[in-house]
Amino acid sequence: MQIFLKTEDEIDLMRKANQLVGATLAELGKHIKPGVTTLQLDKVAEEFIRDHGAIPTFKNFPNPFGEPFPASICTSINDVVVHGIPSEKSVLKEGDIISIDCGTLLEGFNGDSCYTFAVGEISSDVKQLLKVTKESLYLGIEQAIAGNHLGDIGYAIQNHCQCFGYGVVRELTGHGIGKEMHEDPPVRNYGSRGSGILLKEGMCLAIEPMITMGDRKIGLLPDKWSIVTRDRLPAAHYEHTIVVRKGKAEILSSFVEVEHLEGQNF
């Protein structure tokens, strides 16, 4: 395992890439409504990213089968946990939730973030799933400080979500991030206190709880990308890119613009 500690100059570049991801998610939030296709959302995202001088990192990113991802964002609706492929056949409906995962490459460094949006009015049960999943993200981030261990992050996420009876997906993880989208170490959403590698200042991590309303078991669809819950119950996914610091982690990505939109629309 090779972990690259980032310099302050490198972190500045990563901050720019992640700010663009946050702005892209906010731009997409303006378009999320019943009747919109996920392919339309993908076109909005790619144009926005390229207009800001960056590259959509996910486009042509290979899966374990060596097949390139065909779009600029992942659009995962309801029981799709991650890696949903945008399509003109995938039309948003009132009451859906959609997790949009977005990555950018800007000036040689990557940004990565995900947000689960409500499409119109959603049920109270699903609202709670989204709330708890987002809370677990920030509880995990609170543990991402120099001197703690990687397992402290996973424990905080797992403990919070399981208190509500939710499933914590284990086969999918967060990751280190920098010049490459996926770097060491893998950042699990489960674990025990004091386990795993020691966290050091300058580590950049993408922390991303993927939480299911029911059982944590997942399956792969025939498209070899979309990962779904086996029981077909909804899943939520939130992600921030952070820097490990002394005392308090620094969040490089942002939900501020997205949450402002949500306050207006939902």
Can you name each region flagged by the protein language model?
Residues 1-266:
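Active-site neighborhoods and metal-handling regions in enzymes and metal-associated proteins
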